[in-house]
Amino acid sequence: MTASIRPVTPLQAAHLRGTPAILDLEASGFGRQSYPIEVGYVLPDGSSYCSLIRPAPHWTHWDPAAEKVHHIQRDMLDRHGNDIGDIARLLNERLRGLTVFSDGWAHDYPWLQALYEEAGLVPSFKLDSLRSLLTEREERDWEATRELVSRDMKGQRHRASADARMLQSTLVRLRGGASPAYT
């Protein structure tokens, strides 16, 4: 029996060096009836992706309070959202084999599962809690550092990829590194 060794891609190498891939989701609200309306990520190399999600016909829950936070209107999703299956396939292609981190894992995980269930696919990557990366000191200093990074990124909209970049930059700054560019 011959064992095959798969080469590590440049993206996987950057991931292994410590800058994590971060994923964020915006949703129609909170609770069992809510669903993802936007997904965004930033990779260890700084590249990012963001897409509005066209809701499935049976995804009807809409919370005006959530809209006030993310400023995404329901009709924007119908006009500009991408197909659920296309988004799931793209995420699988680009994130394959990575562990991707989220600051709101308890919410983001069910929303990501709803996306994949609707697409009839299984994620090719693992979603984990950003907290699992933090030392006690980093946890203690997280909020103050996030506020500094947020101020530096002034003018960034509250959207999935911008939030993911802010989270990644916060972690990098906590660890004494230069934050990636905010573009």
What does each model-identified segment do?
Residues H58-L77, D128-Q168:
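Active-site-proximal helix-loop-helix substrate-binding element of RNase H-like nuclease domains
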Residues Y116-L127:
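A short alpha->loop->secondary-structure connector
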